[in-house]
Swiss-Prot record:
It comes from the Bacteria. GO terms for molecular function: structural constituent of ribosome. GO terms for biological process: translation. This is Large ribosomal subunit protein bL32. GO terms for cellular component: large ribosomal subunit. The gene is rpmF. Belongs to the bacterial ribosomal protein bL32 family. Keywords: Ribonucleoprotein, Ribosomal protein. The keyword Ribosomal protein applies.
Amino acid sequence: MAVPKKKTSKSRRNMRRSHLALGKVNVIVDSQTGEYKLPHHVSLVDGTYNNRLVVTKKIKTEEEVA
């Protein structure tokens, strides 16, 4: 089994981990609803993309709820 020959210093360990950080998420404000959303994605609030309705919400009837 492989065993390290020398102890890895805190500095070298942290330098190795410097590339593992997560990047910032780019969010924009939706012009119609004012909610935050990811760019180039459909708005989750009203189902619009590029100011066009692309997803319609299904309205549940009383039979489906019960």
